[in-house]
Swiss-Prot record:
Membrane topology field: Multi-pass membrane protein
Key words, A-Z: Membrane, Transmembrane, Transmembrane helix
Record-annotated membrane-spanning stretches: 9-29, 43-63, 75-95, 233-253
Name used for this protein in its record: Tetraspanin-2
Cellular component GO terms, alphabetical: membrane
Locations listed in the record: Membrane
Job of this protein: May be involved in the regulation of cell differentiation.
Superkingdom to which the source organism belongs: Eukaryota
Amino acid sequence: MALANNLTAILNLLALLCSIPITASGIWLASKPDNECVNLLRWPVVVLGVLILVVSATGFIGAYKYKETLLAVYLCCMAILIGLLLVVLIFAFVVTRPDGSYRVPGRGYKEYRLEGFSNWLKENVVDSKNWGRLRACLADTNVCPKLNQEFITADQFFSSSKITPLQSGCCKPPTACGYNFVNPTLWLNPTNMAADADCYLWSNDQSQLCYNCNSCKAGLLGNLRKEWRKANLILIITVVVLIWVYVIACSAFRNAQTEDLFRKYKQGWV
């Protein structure tokens, strides 16, 4: 019985440690400029990480103090949390699978088409009901102004692969419009305005830029997709470890109960 409880305590400690990368991934996502504006996807992972931390601590105390009730609560709650984490992972994978990016000849960065992203993201993140608020939030960030500090010449800008999807979509006009580069957020004399409806929406007003463009909406979704795919990799590894820990903990708990039953039987209590 003591050996089984000690094993369960160690496993709960491991589960508790697993909550750290989950919470850290959520905080990292929430700290990004785009996620600061998109409240819908902001905190689910953080909340799950904190709940796993609390439940794992409960299980650790239950195993350390030989409290079967706490262990039973731990096993029940952890099963629910692992299930919820799997739902979040599968959901995030499905809605971020479509990729609206495309390469532009002579450019180190990609550009983005809104049509290439999932319908769920388009309908729930960048729909007309939400975009006014998102646009104002993005305009208040340092996403576009910092480009003028990082890139001086056109060659530097055009060859860079470090420009984020959000910057590519919101801070400059689409390449097809044929605007001439002055600086990363100032473009003049377009040669092909009919190439894209966004060509007419571009403004050199630094509070406007291409925030009203479909390319900006696509860039925002491109950023979300890129960040969630990175976070998903960490979460997948963590959830595999959590499932492994949970299965062993269930087995140890069941064996401990069986040993306790046999011990009572031998003592004539049953």
